[in-house]
Amino acid sequence: GVELTLNSLVSGLLKQNHFINVVAPFNSKLSDNCSSANLYTVKGEEQISWQHQDYSTETKISESSIVSKMIAKALSLTKDCDAIINLSYDLLPICKTLEVDYPILHLISMGDESLEIKNIISKVYAKHPNNFAFHTRSQASDYPFIKDPIILGNGFEISQYTFQEKKEGPLAWVGRVSPEKGLEDAVYVASKLGEELNVWGFIEDKKYASRIEELYPSGQICWKGYLKTKE
Protein backbone atom coordinates (compact mmCIF):
# COMPACT_ATOMS: atom_id res chain seq x y z
CA GLY A 1 0.00 0.00 0.00
CA VAL A 2 1.77 3.10 1.29
CA GLU A 3 5.16 1.46 0.77
CA LEU A 4 4.44 0.92 -2.93
CA THR A 5 3.04 4.44 -3.26
CA LEU A 6 6.17 5.91 -1.66
CA ASN A 7 8.59 4.01 -3.88
CA SER A 8 6.60 4.86 -7.02
CA LEU A 9 6.37 8.53 -6.04
CA VAL A 10 10.07 8.81 -5.21
CA SER A 11 11.06 7.01 -8.41
CA GLY A 12 8.90 9.34 -10.51
CA LEU A 13 10.21 12.50 -8.85
CA LEU A 14 13.82 11.36 -9.23
CA LYS A 15 13.26 10.85 -12.97
CA GLN A 16 12.22 14.51 -13.12
CA ASN A 17 15.55 15.44 -11.47
CA HIS A 18 14.12 16.36 -8.08
CA PHE A 19 16.25 16.13 -4.93
CA ILE A 20 14.54 13.76 -2.48
CA ASN A 21 14.95 13.00 1.21
CA VAL A 22 12.91 10.11 2.61
CA VAL A 23 12.20 9.78 6.33
CA ALA A 24 11.00 6.33 7.39
CA PRO A 25 10.97 3.95 10.39
CA PHE A 26 14.17 2.17 11.39
CA ASN A 27 15.17 -0.78 9.13
CA SER A 28 13.23 0.64 6.15
CA LYS A 29 14.73 0.25 2.69
CA LEU A 30 14.02 1.91 -0.65
CA SER A 31 13.66 -0.05 -3.87
CA ASP A 32 16.64 -0.18 -6.22
CA ASN A 33 15.18 2.45 -8.56
CA CYS A 34 15.11 4.94 -5.65
CA SER A 35 18.75 4.47 -4.64
CA SER A 36 19.72 8.07 -5.43
CA ALA A 37 17.31 9.41 -2.79
CA ASN A 38 18.63 10.11 0.71
CA LEU A 39 17.08 7.75 3.26
CA TYR A 40 16.88 8.77 6.92
CA THR A 41 15.52 6.19 9.37
CA VAL A 42 14.37 6.86 12.91
CA LYS A 43 13.49 4.69 15.89
CA GLY A 44 10.33 5.19 17.89
CA GLU A 45 7.27 3.70 19.48
CA GLU A 46 4.80 2.28 16.96
CA GLN A 47 1.08 2.87 17.31
CA ILE A 48 -2.04 0.95 16.31
CA SER A 49 -3.27 1.62 12.77
CA TRP A 50 -6.42 3.73 12.65
CA GLN A 51 -8.50 1.12 10.84
CA HIS A 52 -8.10 -1.13 13.91
CA GLN A 53 -9.40 1.47 16.38
CA ASP A 54 -12.86 2.77 17.18
CA TYR A 55 -14.00 5.70 15.04
CA SER A 56 -14.24 8.01 18.07
CA THR A 57 -10.87 7.03 19.60
CA GLU A 58 -8.91 10.06 20.84
CA THR A 59 -5.28 10.42 19.81
CA LYS A 60 -2.52 10.01 22.36
CA ILE A 61 0.84 11.11 20.96
CA SER A 62 3.96 10.64 23.06
CA GLU A 63 7.32 12.25 22.38
CA SER A 64 8.73 8.77 21.81
CA SER A 65 6.20 7.85 19.12
CA ILE A 66 7.56 6.99 15.68
CA VAL A 67 5.31 9.63 14.09
CA SER A 68 6.67 12.36 16.39
CA LYS A 69 10.25 11.34 15.65
CA MET A 70 9.65 11.20 11.89
CA ILE A 71 8.02 14.62 11.61
CA ALA A 72 10.77 16.13 13.78
CA LYS A 73 13.42 14.63 11.49
CA ALA A 74 11.60 15.83 8.36
CA LEU A 75 11.39 19.37 9.74
CA SER A 76 15.11 19.32 10.52
CA LEU A 77 15.83 18.72 6.81
CA THR A 78 13.78 21.60 5.41
CA LYS A 79 16.72 23.95 4.77
CA ASP A 80 17.52 22.42 1.38
CA CYS A 81 13.97 21.35 0.41
CA ASP A 82 10.81 22.96 -0.95
CA ALA A 83 8.16 20.96 0.90
CA ILE A 84 7.36 17.94 3.05
CA ILE A 85 5.06 15.30 1.57
CA ASN A 86 3.27 13.35 4.30
CA LEU A 87 2.00 9.87 3.40
CA SER A 88 0.81 8.89 6.88
CA TYR A 89 -2.84 8.92 7.93
CA ASP A 90 -2.11 10.54 11.27
CA LEU A 91 -3.03 13.55 13.33
CA LEU A 92 0.37 15.09 14.10
CA PRO A 93 1.66 15.82 10.56
CA ILE A 94 -1.68 17.41 9.63
CA CYS A 95 -1.68 19.57 12.79
CA LYS A 96 1.87 20.69 12.05
CA THR A 97 0.64 22.26 8.81
CA LEU A 98 -0.88 25.07 10.89
CA GLU A 99 1.99 25.27 13.38
CA VAL A 100 5.03 25.70 11.14
CA ASP A 101 5.88 28.24 8.45
CA TYR A 102 6.75 25.57 5.90
CA PRO A 103 4.58 23.76 3.33
CA ILE A 104 3.47 20.29 4.41
CA LEU A 105 1.52 18.41 1.73
CA HIS A 106 -0.67 15.40 2.52
CA LEU A 107 -1.56 12.42 0.34
CA ILE A 108 -4.53 10.95 2.21
CA SER A 109 -4.64 7.22 1.46
CA MET A 110 -7.64 6.19 3.58
CA GLY A 111 -11.32 7.00 3.85
CA ASP A 112 -12.96 8.39 6.97
CA GLU A 113 -11.53 6.07 9.66
CA SER A 114 -11.26 8.56 12.54
CA LEU A 115 -13.53 11.39 13.66
CA GLU A 116 -10.57 13.25 15.14
CA ILE A 117 -8.52 13.07 11.94
CA LYS A 118 -11.54 14.00 9.83
CA ASN A 119 -12.03 17.11 11.98
CA ILE A 120 -8.39 18.19 11.75
CA ILE A 121 -8.37 17.64 7.97
CA SER A 122 -11.45 19.90 7.78
CA LYS A 123 -9.75 22.58 9.89
CA VAL A 124 -6.49 22.56 7.92
CA TYR A 125 -8.22 22.20 4.53
CA ALA A 126 -10.18 25.41 5.19
CA LYS A 127 -6.88 27.33 5.23
CA HIS A 128 -4.75 25.19 2.91
CA PRO A 129 -7.01 23.41 0.38
CA ASN A 130 -4.17 22.82 -2.07
CA ASN A 131 -2.13 20.91 0.52
CA PHE A 132 -4.30 17.78 0.28
CA ALA A 133 -4.61 15.08 -2.37
CA PHE A 134 -6.55 11.80 -2.48
CA HIS A 135 -6.26 8.58 -4.45
CA THR A 136 -9.86 8.44 -5.75
CA ARG A 137 -12.97 10.62 -5.85
CA SER A 138 -14.89 7.91 -4.02
CA GLN A 139 -12.38 8.03 -1.18
CA ALA A 140 -12.41 11.84 -1.10
CA SER A 141 -16.23 11.79 -0.86
CA ASP A 142 -15.82 10.47 2.71
CA TYR A 143 -14.83 14.05 3.52
CA PRO A 144 -17.88 16.14 2.47
CA PHE A 145 -16.06 19.45 3.03
CA ILE A 146 -13.68 18.59 0.14
CA LYS A 147 -15.43 20.29 -2.77
CA ASP A 148 -12.95 19.83 -5.61
CA PRO A 149 -10.44 17.14 -4.56
CA ILE A 150 -7.00 16.83 -6.06
CA ILE A 151 -6.77 13.23 -7.25
CA LEU A 152 -3.39 11.52 -7.38
CA GLY A 153 -3.76 7.92 -8.51
CA ASN A 154 -1.27 5.27 -7.52
CA GLY A 155 1.57 5.11 -10.02
CA PHE A 156 3.36 1.87 -10.82
CA GLU A 157 6.90 1.25 -12.01
CA ILE A 158 5.79 -0.69 -15.10
CA SER A 159 9.26 -2.10 -15.75
CA GLN A 160 8.94 -4.19 -12.57
CA TYR A 161 5.93 -6.11 -13.87
CA THR A 162 5.45 -8.63 -16.67
CA PHE A 163 2.27 -8.34 -18.72
CA GLN A 164 0.36 -11.62 -19.04
CA GLU A 165 -1.79 -11.70 -22.16
CA LYS A 166 -4.40 -14.25 -21.11
CA LYS A 167 -8.12 -14.10 -21.81
CA GLU A 168 -9.01 -16.88 -19.40
CA GLY A 169 -8.63 -16.94 -15.60
CA PRO A 170 -7.70 -17.25 -12.90
CA LEU A 171 -8.38 -13.81 -11.49
CA ALA A 172 -5.99 -12.09 -9.08
CA TRP A 173 -6.46 -9.99 -5.95
CA VAL A 174 -3.56 -8.24 -4.19
CA GLY A 175 -3.81 -6.65 -0.76
CA ARG A 176 -3.70 -7.09 2.98
CA VAL A 177 -6.43 -9.54 4.02
CA SER A 178 -8.60 -7.70 6.55
CA PRO A 179 -12.29 -6.64 6.57
CA GLU A 180 -11.84 -3.05 5.34
CA LYS A 181 -10.21 -4.32 2.12
CA GLY A 182 -13.39 -6.01 0.86
CA LEU A 183 -11.93 -9.29 -0.37
CA GLU A 184 -15.41 -10.84 -0.34
CA ASP A 185 -16.42 -8.65 -3.30
CA ALA A 186 -13.58 -10.05 -5.41
CA VAL A 187 -14.48 -13.64 -4.44
CA TYR A 188 -18.11 -12.96 -5.38
CA VAL A 189 -17.11 -11.69 -8.83
CA ALA A 190 -14.79 -14.66 -9.39
CA SER A 191 -17.54 -17.12 -8.42
CA LYS A 192 -20.02 -15.49 -10.81
CA LEU A 193 -17.48 -15.78 -13.63
CA GLY A 194 -16.67 -19.37 -12.72
CA GLU A 195 -13.03 -18.48 -12.13
CA GLU A 196 -10.58 -19.28 -9.36
CA LEU A 197 -9.29 -16.28 -7.39
CA ASN A 198 -5.58 -16.10 -6.58
CA VAL A 199 -5.01 -13.97 -3.48
CA TRP A 200 -1.63 -12.38 -2.75
CA GLY A 201 -1.15 -10.56 0.54
CA PHE A 202 -0.54 -10.85 4.25
CA ILE A 203 -3.48 -12.52 6.04
CA GLU A 204 -3.84 -10.11 8.94
CA ASP A 205 -7.29 -11.32 10.02
CA LYS A 206 -7.40 -15.13 9.84
CA LYS A 207 -11.00 -15.32 11.13
CA TYR A 208 -12.12 -12.98 8.34
CA ALA A 209 -10.31 -15.10 5.75
CA SER A 210 -11.92 -18.28 7.13
CA ARG A 211 -15.42 -16.74 7.04
CA ILE A 212 -15.03 -15.91 3.36
CA GLU A 213 -13.73 -19.40 2.56
CA GLU A 214 -16.78 -20.96 4.23
CA LEU A 215 -19.14 -19.03 1.93
CA TYR A 216 -17.75 -20.52 -1.28
CA PRO A 217 -16.86 -23.98 -2.64
CA SER A 218 -13.47 -25.48 -1.82
CA GLY A 219 -10.82 -24.30 -4.27
CA GLN A 220 -12.56 -21.02 -5.10
CA ILE A 221 -9.76 -19.12 -3.33
CA CYS A 222 -6.09 -19.96 -3.78
CA TRP A 223 -3.95 -18.29 -1.10
CA LYS A 224 -0.58 -17.30 -2.61
CA GLY A 225 0.98 -15.63 0.43
CA TYR A 226 2.83 -12.34 0.83
CA LEU A 227 5.54 -11.75 -1.76
CA LYS A 228 7.92 -8.97 -2.66
CA THR A 229 7.22 -7.05 -5.88
CA LYS A 230 10.00 -8.85 -7.77
CA GLU A 231 8.43 -12.19 -6.90
Predicted regions and their residues:
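Catalytic cores of nucleotide-sugar-dependent glycosyltransferases that transfer UDP/GDP/TDP-activated
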Residues: 1-231
